[in-house]
A protein has these predicted regions:
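Jelly-roll (double-stranded beta-helix
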Residues: 1-81, 89-207
Length: 207
């Protein structure tokens, strides 16, 4: 296939990035390659067994995560890349006019994703409600989970209830060990490694 100019592709598909959708899939086979725009704010945190790659092409975004059990705010600025390790709760927040690339790997048939709400979005120290589900299409498969949360007593009271808002034995264990490295400029990295790359050497963007 022919190479694709990302900015030209974005202009052609700009209507797909209007709210409430704000994203469009470019490729799906082994890897899901999607572009996500804004505005997009959410109160849930997503967990998955694989890593996620972010490249912020236009504008900035914020990515609250839960690292070692504590909330941490990752700011991914225009031109920066970031690799989110597996099994870390994360909640992408995108501003109007922003535009970025996200790459996820295809899920295994027996693999479940998680969607979680906390009693306090700013602290993330107590789980309010969560569900685990098979995810083959993020935009489609999240909808019934979000609707189930909105219909729950926990959503109304913002307090953990006796009706099983939290999964006692989750099929996906949260990573409580990994410390996340900060985002960095892709252009600066390319310039730093220009000599090696020009000689055809293969380098890992994330060692």
């Amino acid at each position: 296939t022919e190479p694709t100019n990302v900015l030209d592709w974005y202009e052609t598909n700009k209507a797909a990035f209007a709210p409430p959708v704000c994203n469009k899939l470019m490729h799906k086979r082994q890897l899901s390659i999607m572009f996500v725009g804004g505005p997009n704010t959410r109160t849930d945190f997503h967990l998955e067994a694989g890593a996620e790659f972010f490249w912020q092409i236009q504008g900035d975004m914020e990515l609250p995560i839960v690292e070692r059990g504590k909330r941490k705010l990752i700011k991914i600025r225009e031109g920066e890349v970031f690799l989110l390790p597996p099994r870390l709760p994360h909640s992408p927040q995108r501003t109007e006019g922003s535009f970025g690339l996200v790459i996820e790997r295809e899920r295994a048939p027996d693999e479940l994703d998680g969607l979680r709400w906390y009693t306090d979005f700013e602290k993330c120290d107590e789980v309010l409600w969560e569900r685990y589900f098979y995810c083959s299409d993020l935009g489609r498969d999240l909808v019934p989970v979000v609707e189930a949360f909105k219909a729950s007593d926990e959503c109304t009271t913002m307090r953990p209830g006796p009706n099983g808002g939290r999964v006692t034995t989750p099929p996906l264990e949260q990573d409580m060990i990994t410390m996340v490295p900060p985002p960095f400029s892709l252009q600066a990295w390319l310039e730093e490694h220009e000599d090696d790359l020009s000689q055809g050497h293969h380098l890992n963007l994330f060692p």
